[in-house]
Amino acid sequence: VSDHLLADGQEKKKKIALNIDTKMLKIGFVGGGKMAQALARGFIRAGLSKGEMMLASCLPNDVGSIDAFKEIGSNTVFSNAPVVDYGDVLILSVKPQVVPMVLPDLKNYKKLLLSIAMGIPLASLEKALPEGTPVIRVMPNTPALVGCGATVYARGKHAGDKEAEIAEKLFSSVGLCEEVSENLIDPVTALAGSGPAYVYMMIEALADGGVKMGLMRPIAYKLAAQTVLGAGTMVRDTNTHPGQLKDDVASPAGSTITGIHYLEDHGLRSAIIGAVEAATKRCKEVSSLSEKN
């Protein structure tokens, strides 16, 4: 079923015209945290907007975010109302627990809303907005901070091809961007949203292993990070199954297959699969709580 739904999302993507109006977009951010900052920089790099064409709402004591937007030429305000009235596109970029507090500020908003708030369903957002408001739910991950994000999005019932193309063009500026059905957002969050944390643990463990075997910690971290980067690039760019790439490294009776046997014996695969499953369940719990509220 999931494969069918993913294929359905990919089919929708194929139908999107590639001639979006390329005029610069005025963009408002409700919430000016690190992800909003990363997106703003990506939009500027891609020529989709300019610093002076973006406005973000921040808490008065969030000096770091205020300064970050100032550095790219953007203004910040301490309330949401000016941001809601400001641009062509509004990005809801606050923590999920804050969403119920800011939605009343959007009660008259009728333009395109892109929500990156984890676990907040499209139905909850659409219910709080005027009928007909186009809403798209987006799930980026933190590597978007360095332009290597993995993002998916799902359309609300009033978001058409034009709105989907705007979302895809914006989020493609900070990495990969794909369309999926909304019921796949939770497993995507567990895999790609939480996945960097799992990989950081792997990098740390690889480095610790190197240190245990005599490497100095600085070079151990560099080698571990570069190894993960290189392996990921191989999977992405060669279109080769990761199992085949693994086999290519593992010589008969060699050190690699010996290490693989140790990992298999200690349940590495099962632990990672279980982590994605557990994180998906937690995402669904958050979504369920949001719907009740």
Predicted features along the sequence, with ranges:
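NAD(P)+-binding Rossmann beta1-loop-alpha1 motif at the extreme N-terminus of oxidoreductases
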Residues: 18-78, 148-149, 211-212
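NAD(P)-dependent Rossmann-like dehydrogenase/reductase catalytic/cofactor-binding core
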Residues: 19-23, 225-293
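A short glycine-threonine-serine/GTX helix/turn-capping micro-motif
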Residues: 188-197, 218, 246
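Internal alpha-helical scaffold of NAD(P)-dependent oxidoreductase catalytic cores
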Residues: 124-134, 150-187, 200-237, 282
